[in-house]
């Protein structure tokens, strides 16, 4: 069966979109340790961490980078990648959703209800650098 020209034209834009998404940094990421957890971070995206030191607008650097991946390939640290830094900007200090803890002992008339809201910091990933050079 021969392929019609209309089908060939339809597949070309899909390929160009895939290439455009690769060049925009979709495959650039770093896995870092922060707030006792591991996060997968990509440039120009925001994330919520447990409360970090710093005021709104301050710059924060994370040096506990476990893995860095870019166009050149991935670099895995043991335990951390040498000279890798993720630069963040503090956007806001927030509070997470309310979590209700309800404890009850049946037949004892004992009930206890507690609520908790976690203190969070919203940050924007500005850049990922390895050895002083931006990730490419």
Swiss-Prot record:
<dbReference type="GO" id="GO:0003735">
    <property type="term" value="F:structural constituent of ribosome"/>
</dbReference>
<dbReference type="GO" id="GO:0005840">
    <property type="term" value="C:ribosome"/>
</dbReference>
<dbReference type="InterPro" id="IPR018258">
    <property type="entry name" value="Ribosomal_bL21_CS"/>
</dbReference>
<feature type="region of interest" description="Disordered">
    <location>
        <begin position="1"/>
        <end position="25"/>
    </location>
</feature>
<keyword id="KW-0689">Ribosomal protein</keyword>
<comment type="subunit">
    <text>Part of the 50S ribosomal subunit. Contacts protein L20.</text>
</comment>
<protein>
    <recommendedName>
        <fullName>Large ribosomal subunit protein bL21</fullName>
    </recommendedName>
</protein>
<dbReference type="GO" id="GO:0019843">
    <property type="term" value="F:rRNA binding"/>
</dbReference>
<keyword id="KW-0694">RNA-binding</keyword>
<keyword id="KW-0699">rRNA-binding</keyword>
<comment type="similarity">
    <text>Belongs to the bacterial ribosomal protein bL21 family.</text>
</comment>
<dbReference type="GO" id="GO:1990904">
    <property type="term" value="C:ribonucleoprotein complex"/>
</dbReference>
<feature type="compositionally biased region" description="Low complexity">
    <location>
        <begin position="1"/>
        <end position="21"/>
    </location>
</feature>
<dbReference type="GO" id="GO:0006412">
    <property type="term" value="P:translation"/>
</dbReference>
<dbReference type="InterPro" id="IPR036164">
    <property type="entry name" value="bL21-like_sf"/>
</dbReference>
<dbReference type="InterPro" id="IPR001787">
    <property type="entry name" value="Ribosomal_bL21"/>
</dbReference>
<dbReference type="GO" id="GO:0005737">
    <property type="term" value="C:cytoplasm"/>
</dbReference>
<dbReference type="InterPro" id="IPR028909">
    <property type="entry name" value="bL21-like"/>
</dbReference>
<keyword id="KW-0687">Ribonucleoprotein</keyword>
<dbReference type="Pfam" id="PF00829">
    <property type="entry name" value="Ribosomal_L21p"/>
</dbReference>
<comment type="function">
    <text>This protein binds to 23S rRNA in the presence of protein L20.</text>
</comment>
């Amino acid at each position: 069966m021969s392929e019609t020209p209309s089908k060939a034209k339809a597949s070309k834009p899909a390929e160009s979109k895939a290439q455009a998404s690769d060049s925009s940094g979709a495959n650039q990421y770093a896995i870092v340790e922060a707030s006792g957890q591991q996060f997968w971070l990509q440039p120009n995206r925001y994330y919520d961490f447990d409360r970090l030191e710093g005021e709104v607008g301050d710059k924060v650097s994370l040096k506990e980078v476990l893995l860095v991946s870019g166009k050149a390939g991935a670099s895995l640290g043991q335990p951390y990648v040498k000279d890798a830094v993720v630069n963040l900007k503090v956007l806001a200090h927030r509070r997470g959703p309310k979590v209700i803890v309800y404890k009850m002992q049946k037949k004892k008339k004992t009930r206890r209800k507690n609520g908790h809201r976690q203190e969070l910091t919203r940050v924007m990933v500005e850049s990922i650098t390895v050895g002083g050079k931006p990730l490419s």
